[in-house]
C-alpha cells in the first residue's frame, strides 16, 4: 500500500485522526521553512481553512508542498476535514485540491472525525490502492 501525507495545524485535529487511523503517514511540517518530498504515490489528508470561502481554504504549507512538481505528480487522491458550521464550504480544501490537481476527492470528515470516519477511511484507502495500477 502506498502512503498517506497529511497536514495538521497546531489544533492537532488532523494529527489525532491520523493517529487513530493507524496507517503509515508522513506529515507536512507546520514550519513553512521545512520541506518534505515524497517518493511514492500518496493520498493527501488536509484540513480546510478560511471560514467558508475558497480563498484561503488550503493551508499555505500544503500549497507550498503541492507547488513542488514532484510531490504534485504523485498525488492520487484527497481527503479533507472541515467544520460543518461552514455549510457548503465544509471540507472546501478537498474540492480545491481535487479540481486543481485532477485527482478524486475521496472523503471528508468533521474536525478530528468519528469512529465511523476512521473505519470508512481505513477501508476506503485500502480499497482505493487495490484498484490502482501497480505503477500508478
Swiss-Prot record:
InterPro entries in alphabetical order: Flavoprotein-like_sf, RNR_Ib_NrdI_bac, RNR_NrdI
Annotated coiled-coil segments of the chain: none
GO molecular function: FMN binding
Alphabetical GO biological process terms: protein modification process
A matching Pfam family: Flavodoxin_NdrI
Family listed: Belongs to the NrdI family.
Physiological role: Probably involved in ribonucleotide reductase function.
PANTHER family for the chain: PROTEIN NRDI
Protein name as catalogued: Protein NrdI
Organism: Escherichia coli O139:H28 (strain E24377A / ETEC)
Amino acid at each position: 500500500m502506498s502512503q498517506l501525507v497529511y497536514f495538521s495545524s497546531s489544533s492537532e485535529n488532523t494529527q489525532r485522526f491520523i493517529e487513530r487511523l493507524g496507517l503509515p503517514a508522513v506529515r507536512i511540517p507546520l514550519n513553512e521553512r521545512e520541506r518534505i518530498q515524497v517518493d511514492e504515490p500518496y493520498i493527501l489528508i488536509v484540513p480546510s481553512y478560511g471560514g467558508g470561502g475558497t480563498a484561503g481554504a488550503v493551508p499555505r504549507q500544503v500549497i507550498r508542498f503541492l507547488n513542488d512538481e514532484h510531490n504534485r505528480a504523485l498525488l492520487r487522491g484527497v481527503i479533507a476535514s472541515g467544520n460543518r458550521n461552514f455549510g457548503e464550504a465544509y471540507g472546501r480544501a478537498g474540492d480545491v485540491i481535487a479540481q486543481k490537481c485532477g485527482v478524486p476527492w475521496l472523503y471528508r470528515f468533521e474536525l478530528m472525525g468519528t469512529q465511523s470516519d476512521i473505519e470508512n477511511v481505513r477501508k476506503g484507502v485500502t480499497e482505493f490502492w487495490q484498484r490502482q495500477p501497480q505503477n500508478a
